[in-house]
Amino acid sequence: QMTSELAWRVAAEESEEMQKIRENVITLIVPVMNPDGLDIVVDWYRKNLGTPFENTSPPILYQKYVGHDNNRDWFMNNMPETYNVTKILYNEWYPQIVYNHHQSSPSWTKISIPPYADPVNPKIHPAITAAVSEVGSAMSKRFSLENMPGAIADNFYTMFWNGGGRTVPYYHNMIGILTETGHTTPTPRFYDPEKLPKTV
C-alpha cells in the first residue's frame, strides 16, 4: 500500500529532495485508519480474484458499527479511530497540512486533487481556502512535470461540508487535502476513450 512505501521513502531515500524534506518537515503517518476493514476488503478481493465478483465490495460492513462511514466521523468523534487521530491533530501536534489519502477516483481518472468545486463554506477563513488551492496547484504542476496524466480538480468535492477528515482541519486553521486515487480494486481496467467525458 502507498503509506508503507511513503514511510520507507521518507526514512531511507537519499535523493536530494527527500533529504531536504527530512531536514525541514516533521511527517506523521497513519498507515491505515481501519486495519480490520482493510483486511476484510483485501481478503474479499483475493477470495474472488478471477470470478465475476472480483470487482465487487464485501457484503459486510468493514467497521462493526459504521462501515465506511468512519471517514465521516471527524466532528463527532464517535469512533475510537477518529477520536485518537483528532487528539493527535488538534491537541498534540497541530500540523500545517493534513493529507487524507483515499480511493477511488472517478472511473476514468488516476487521481482527484484540489482545488475543489464550489461552494466554499463561508465559515472557512479565506487564507485556508487559498492555501488549499495553492497546494492543489503545486500537485498539478508536479504531475505535469513528471509526465503523470490523469489528475483532475474542481470536480465532485466541495469545501462546504464540515465533517470529513479533510474538512474539519479547516476550522483549526490547517490545510486539509483529500485525494482519491485509482479505482476500488487492483484489477487493471480499460476505459474506452469514446466513452470518456469530452472537454468543451
Which residues make up each language-model segment?
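Active-site/substrate-binding loop(s) of hydrolase catalytic cores
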Residues: 1-134, 141-145
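Hard-cation-handling environments
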Residues: 148-200
